[in-house]
Amino acid sequence: MIINHNMSAMFAQRTLGVTNNAIGKDME
């Protein structure tokens, strides 16, 4: 359970990073 939670947390963090990158490129 803990490992699964860590994996989903990492996945969410990565998804947020990609989204922020896309937004930053859109703004430029």
Curated annotation (Swiss-Prot):
Task performed by this protein: Component of the core of the flagella.
Protein's UniProt name: Flagellar filament 34 kDa core protein
Assembly and binders: The flagellum consists of an outer layer composed of repeating units of FlaA around a core that contains several antigenically related polypeptides.
Species per Swiss-Prot/TrEMBL record: Treponema phagedenis
Sequence similarity: Belongs to the bacterial flagellin family.
The entry's keywords: Bacterial flagellum, Periplasm
GO cellular component term of the entry, any: periplasmic flagellum
Compartments in which it is found: Periplasmic flagellum; Periplasm
